[in-house]
Amino acid sequence: MNVLLGGLVIFATFVTLCNGSCYVIRHKIVPGETIKECTDLKGNKHPLDSRWRTEDCELCACRDIEISCCSLVSTPVGYDRHNCRKIFNKETCKISVVEKTDPNRPCGVSGWIS
C-alpha cells in the first residue's frame, strides 16, 4: 500500500510539473524566402535560434518555423485563501503566499502549477 501511495505522489508531482503554460506563434512562410529572425507579439525582432525572457515572465525561443513561449511563473494551489494572499514579484517571476495580517509570515502551500 505504501508503494502505491508513493507512486501516486510521484505521479501527481510529475503531472503538476508538466502542466506548463505555453503557446506557439507560427511564422508566415513565403516560398523561396529564408527565415533569419522572429518577431514577437510586441513587435520586437530576435535572431534565429535565440532565446529570451519577456517582461511577462515567459521564456521564448526563435526557431525556423515558429516562436515558442512558456510561462516561468508557478501558481500556488491548496493554501488558505481566507487568511493568505498571493504576492507576485515580476523581477524574479515568482509568487509568494503570505498572511494577510502579517505579510512577513509565509503561508503553507500544498502544490504549485507551472
UniProtKB/Swiss-Prot annotation:
InterPro entries: PSP94 (IPR008735). Residues 1-20 form the signal peptide. Keywords: Disulfide bond, Secreted, Signal. One of its GO terms (cellular component) is extracellular region. Disulfide bonds join C22-C70, C38-C62, C57-C93, C60-C69, C84-C107. It is found in: Secreted. Pfam families: PSP94. Belongs to the beta-microseminoprotein family. This is Beta-microseminoprotein E1. It comes from Saguinus oedipus. The lineage of its organism: Eukaryota, Metazoa, Chordata, Craniata, Vertebrata. The gene is MSPE.
